[in-house]
Curated annotation (Swiss-Prot):
SMART domains: EFP (SM01185), Elong-fact-P_C (SM00841)
Protein name: Elongation factor P
Physiological role: Involved in peptide bond synthesis. Stimulates efficient translation and peptide-bond synthesis on native or reconstituted 70S ribosomes in vitro. Probably functions indirectly by altering the affinity of the ribosome for aminoacyl-tRNA, thus increasing their reactivity as acceptors for peptidyl transferase.
Keyword Cell wall biogenesis/degradation in record: no
Swiss-Prot/TrEMBL keywords: Cytoplasm, Elongation factor, Protein biosynthesis
PROSITE patterns (alphabetical): EFP (PS01275)
GO cellular-component term (any): cytoplasm
Organism of this sequence: Caldicellulosiruptor saccharolyticus (strain ATCC 43494 / DSM 8903 / Tp8T 6331)
Protein family membership: Belongs to the elongation factor P family.
GO molecular function, one term: translation elongation factor activity
Pathway recorded for this protein: Protein biosynthesis; polypeptide chain elongation
Length: 185
């Protein structure tokens, strides 16, 4: 059992007899009245997203989720193919199931496939990835403003904000959960 006040992004719960994944949550403490937790929940079977408000002390059961490490093989334009590195079993998932999870994932990287009762519902990328910058504006001498950033395109096609000293060809470390630059490698 988990209390609504302990919700985190990615947590899976049972609610109204169905399995939901917490997409967003916000703890609200109004000036007057009791605190509450405003959430966006995604039904893992149908993909439907609902908004629901809970009291922070409201309890609900956690859903048991199976996690399998698999290697991302390729995308044929329609489906994404993954392989279990121990059994060599391959599965194909559509864009709806994958979502933005592969935004920072190259072919042959290891990802986590999420399933419930044998039914796959999502993909979790590795927490940190190292990618090469393929396009960005050059940094100029004197661009030393604190915290200044510029857009940079990495080899997977995703665009993130990076510090001004990053150039084309640099390898950078990215946190996939926040989609933020961490360091130069």
């Amino acid at each position: 059992m988990v209390e609504a006040g302990d919700f985190r992004r990615g947590l899976t719960i049972e609610y109204d007899g169905q399995i939901f994944q917490v997409i967003e949550f916000l703890h609200v403490k109004p000036g007057k009245g009791a605190a509450f937790v405003r959430t966006k929940l995604k039904n893992i079977k149908t993909g439907a997203v609902i908004e629901k408000t809970f009291r922070p002390d409201e309890r609900m059961p956690l859903a048991h989720i199976e996690r399998r490490e698999m290697q991302y093989l390729y995308n044929d334009g329609e489906l994404y193919y993954f392989m279990d590195t121990q059994t060599y079993e391959q599965i194909a998932l559509n864009q709806e199931m994958v979502g933005d999870a592969l935004k920072f994932v190259k072919e042959n990287m290891t990802v986590t496939i999420l399933s419930h009762n044998g039914s796959v519902f999502g993909v979790e990328p590795p927490r940190f990835v190292e990618l090469e910058v393929i396009d960005t504006e050059p940094g100029f001498k004197g661009d030393t403003q604190t915290g200044a950033t510029k857009p940079a395109k990495v080899e997977t096609g995703a665009v993130i904000q990076v510090p001004l000293f990053i150039n084309v060809g640099d390898k950078i470390k990215i946190d996939t959960s926040t989609e933020e630059y961490l360091s130069r490698v």
